[in-house]
């Protein structure tokens, strides 16, 4: 790769990712209200929405689990730009559907389109963008570059959420569809291929008719099965070759498992307990996105050379856990806003893990390695709804098993709940104080 194309390629990549993420994120604050209005109008609680959301996450996760390594591996052979075209184009379809109408029937059409397009789109654009950056940046600068890429996505998140805060729901989906189209056109016109033409093994689009496209090794209908088996073997081989890669995969799985459960349940929890709506969701996301942007664009390039990726990974995981804990014990509507500020540090893990992974493989395996980590995150997204969707519905229902003060999803706290909770904690403190003489006498 010639150095003269490096900066230009990354600049166009950053613009492409900004436009794409803007189109994806602008609809996030309104989807809860749209889903509830289409399926359970006039209600703040809806089991159908929770289970449909979980089902969509499971289907998307299972599909992405198989697709991500395949997309990454194909991009190693046929180029990042070529593979980016498919998910970015498919992303337009569900957004255009909701821009047309948001009735119950259209919502189900959107649901089906979104579920099956997300199998290819969910995570693949970021996976290919990370591989693109790895093609153009030296190992020593990859963590900072990945952080900048994540910061660009966070900036898009903030800008999109600000727009959603002031736009109507209908206009929001129209803007999203327009930006999705614009991002695809910009990518095709301006983004240069990061892999030199002489290193690409084959072109996906060819003038000659291929008997078995992209699957030259195994003839006949056994090709698809054989390729899936081969991808699994390649994943296992990469894991065995590198202990750090295996460790990052495990950390990625468990952190994604927690994050997926939090994102799947927190919006319904906040809506049921504090009656959050589109505007409050947008405010919360703006705080989270702004903190993430500042962290990735300003703190990450400074902290990586001083602390290295491993320490930053530990710091990020600690603050991510603290954010989840603070949110789950929220006793007032302002607590989620304070928890969102933790994104200053909780956003570190993804960039750090991707950087560590990129250093464990050769340049011709970057797409495959990033695809493996993305597929492991997808596996966590499959497992998470199986546990969190029933639990969320159970604790949001009238038959919740218990109502532990401040540590419950129960939407109908008793009257004067804040006073009751304060008295509860005061009683705990007093009990501990009274126990001190007894503990000293018996055990010290």
Regions found by a protein language model. Give the residues of each.
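C-terminal ends and interior cores of transmembrane alpha-helices
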Residues: 85, 89-105, 318-331
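Hydrophobic core of transmembrane alpha-helices in multi-pass small-molecule transporters
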Residues: 18, 94, 105-124, 334-350
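Cytoplasmic helix-loop-helix junction between adjacent transmembrane helices
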Residues: 112-153
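Helix-to-loop junctions at the C-terminal end of transmembrane segments
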Residues: 66-80, 295-309, 392
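A membrane-interface helix-boundary motif in multi-pass transporters
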Residues: 166-180, 390-416
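Short amphipathic helix-loop junctions that connect adjacent transmembrane helices
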Residues: 30-50, 264-281
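Juxtamembrane intracellular "pre-TM" segments in multi-pass secondary transporters
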Residues: 1-10, 193-251, 272-273
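Glycine-rich segments within core transmembrane alpha-helices of 12-TM secondary carriers
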Residues: 141-165, 180, 376-387
């Amino acid at each position: 790769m010639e150095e003269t194309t490096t900066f230009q390629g990354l600049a166009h990549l950053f613009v492409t990712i900004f436009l794409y993420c803007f189109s994806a994120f602008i609809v996030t604050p309104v989807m809860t209200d749209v889903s509830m209005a289409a399926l359970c109008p006039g209600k703040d609680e809806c089991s159908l929405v929770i289970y449909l959301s979980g089902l969509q996450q499971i289907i998307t996760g299972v599909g992405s689990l198989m697709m991500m390594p395949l997309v990454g591996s194909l991009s190693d052979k046929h180029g990042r730009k070529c593979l980016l075209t498919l998910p970015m184009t498919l992303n337009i379809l569900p957004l255009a559907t909701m821009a047309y109408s948001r009735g119950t029937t259209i919502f189900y059409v959107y649901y089906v389109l979104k579920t099956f397009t997300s199998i290819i789109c969910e995570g693949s654009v970021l996976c290919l963008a990370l591989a693109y950056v790895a093609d153009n940046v030296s190992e020593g600068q990859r963590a900072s570059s990945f952080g900048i890429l994540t910061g660009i996505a966070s900036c898009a998140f903030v800008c999109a959420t600000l727009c959603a805060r002031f736009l109507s729901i209908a206009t929001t989906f129209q803007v999203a569809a327009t930006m999705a189209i614009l991002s695809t056109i910009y990518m095709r016109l301006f983004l240069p291929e990061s892999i030199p033409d002489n290193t690409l093994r084959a072109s996906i689009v060819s003038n000659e008719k291929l008997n078995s496209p992209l699957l030259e090794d195994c003839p006949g209908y056994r090709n698809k099965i054989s390729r899936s088996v081969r991808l699994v073997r390649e994943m296992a081989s990469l894991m065995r070759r590198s202990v750090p890669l295996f460790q990052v995969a495990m950390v990625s799985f468990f952190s994604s498992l927690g994050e997926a459960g939090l994102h799947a349940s927190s919006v319904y929890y906040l809506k049921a307990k504090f009656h959050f709506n589109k505007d409050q969701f947008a405010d919360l996301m703006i705080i989270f996105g702004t903190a993430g942007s500042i962290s990735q664009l300003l703190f990450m390039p400074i902290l990586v050379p001083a602390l290295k990726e491993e320490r930053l990974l530990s710091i990020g995981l600690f603050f991510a856990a603290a954010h989840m804990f603070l949110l789950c014990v929220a006793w007032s509507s302002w607590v989620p806003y304070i928890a969102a500020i933790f994104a200053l540090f909780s956003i570190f893990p993804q960039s750090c893990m991707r950087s560590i992974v990129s250093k464990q493989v050769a340049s011709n395996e970057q797409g495959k390695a990033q695809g493996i980590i993305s597929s492991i995150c997808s596996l966590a997204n499959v497992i998470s709804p199986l546990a969190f969707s029933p639990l969320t519905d159970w604790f949001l229902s009238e038959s919740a098993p218990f109502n532990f003060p401040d540590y419950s999803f129960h939407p109908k706290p008793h009257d004067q709940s804040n006073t009751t909770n304060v008295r509860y904690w005061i009683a705990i403190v007093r009990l501990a104080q009274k126990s001190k003489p007894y503990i000293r006498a018996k055990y010290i």
